[in-house]
Amino acid sequence: MQVSEILNSGLKREIKITVPAEDMEARLMARLEDAKNKVRLKGFRPGKVPLQHLRRMYGKSFMAEVVNEILNDSSRTIISDRGEKPAMQPEISMTEDEKEAEKVLAGAADFEFSLSYEVIPPIEIKDLAGIKITRPVYDVPDEEVDEQVKRVADSVRTYEAKKGKAEKGDKVTLDYVGKLDGEPFDGGSANDSEVVIGHGQFIPGFEDELIGLKAGDTKTFKITFPETYGAQHLAGKEAEFDVTVKEVAAAEELVIDDELAKKLGLESAEKLREIIRSQLENQYGQMTRQKAKRQLLDALDESYKFEAPSKLVEAEFNNIWSQVTRDLESAGRTFEDEETTEDDARQEYQRLAERRVRLGLVLAQIGEEASIQVSDDEMQRALIETIRRYPAQQQQEIYDFYRQNPQALASVRAPLFEEKVVDQLLSQVDVTDQKVSRDELLAEDEAEGEEKKAAGETKKKAAPKKKAAKKESAAE
């Protein structure tokens, strides 16, 4: 087998491989000899089939197997022997001339093919000294825990129907029809809808219009949808609503005690508070870690400047762009609504793709040198968490897909590996904790906003069709 380099420019490589006809013939004869003792042909005793007869029958198919074997096995070996790591699967090129291909399959010509690929550049890991990170830490006050406990407890609050007028805190059962320019609009109507006045379930102003109404009352009023409303065809528009109140119910006194906790499946009110505090601390702790991670990645981005493989960058950009445009389309928004242009957005996300690829390669190299591993148990837990996002009837099928598809499984492993590398780096750099307020912790800088959009965490999404009158949830 002869290997010659055709292209060596930057990270791009192209090599030509020639397997002499006599080598191909030897590989074919080895397969025929192996088949000789296995095939059963009428008129021949086992193991007595002449090789030439076998060749006439199976020669081309066996030679095709030899070609595939060389392409699959030799390609990896050749690149590895060159001391290179391909960024992606090499592109294989070989003759498209049918006559030439027939000669190869007949063992009458050399088998020639070429591999085109980009290499992962060598990365020399630098000293972490000098990287300083300020980690924002928010101490959850008792008042916030109390407020959240009340919200959770409110989910099991009972209401008693009353004859009087609706007040703030009352639950109103109603039918409504929303109209634009006198015509009902899609998703703007509902029957037997329940709303607790003051809870902010509906768009601003809607719940206030219900105050003072009694069961049996009807009312028509106008409300303007917020400019930032998720459904673009409703954003900023004035709509008219016809409302019929079916029932007004007053909230019974809410006492947060052990009995209420038991309704929630807990043994005591103290346990409820303990769980709520733990959830809040975990939630804010994740935000703290993400901001520390962001600073770490920014520092690494400044330290490591090298050419990233263009194919990896292209693939990353395509993933980002697909997510961004899909989210915009589902929200009924445009780049103008995001105060940018498509060209500017492309440039921004191209830079983000390059950054992600570079940092991914750096973290991979650091993890490799530190012998960081993702255990089977960690993979299993992550896989189970992944398939739980799918409907129950699909979960076994999804599980089997991941277990049988190495590339899909690698997509589960990659974020686990990255987080373990980040954890190790955070334990090695200079980290200073800084007490901050809740608002300061929740504040999002521009770079974080772009990352979230690229990850599909857009702030503005389309409202569910049957709830167009309702306000977007906090997550949206």
UniProtKB/Swiss-Prot annotation:
Its EC number is 5.2.1.8. Gene3D superfamilies: 3.10.50.40, Trigger factor ribosome-binding domain (3.30.70.1050), Trigger factor, C-terminal domain (1.10.3120.10). Keywords: Cell cycle, Cell division, Chaperone, Cytoplasm, Isomerase, Rotamase. Pfam families: FKBP_C, Trigger_C, Trigger_N. Residues 437-476 are annotated as: Disordered. One of its GO terms (molecular function) is peptidyl-prolyl cis-trans isomerase activity. It comes from the Bacteria. Residues 450-460 have a biased composition (Basic and acidic residues). It catalyses: [protein]-peptidylproline (omega=180) = [protein]-peptidylproline (omega=0). GO terms for cellular component: cytoplasm. The keyword Isomerase applies. Residues 169-254 form the PPIase FKBP-type domain. One of its GO terms (biological process) is protein transport. It is found in: Cytoplasm. HAMAP family: Trigger_factor_Tig. Involved in protein export. Acts as a chaperone by maintaining the newly synthesized protein in an open conformation. Functions as a peptidyl-prolyl cis-trans isomerase. Consists of 3 domains; the N-terminus binds the ribosome, the middle domain has PPIase activity, while the C-terminus has intrinsic chaperone activity on its own. Belongs to the FKBP-type PPIase family. Tig subfamily. This is Trigger factor. It comes from Chelativorans sp. (strain BNC1). The gene is tig.
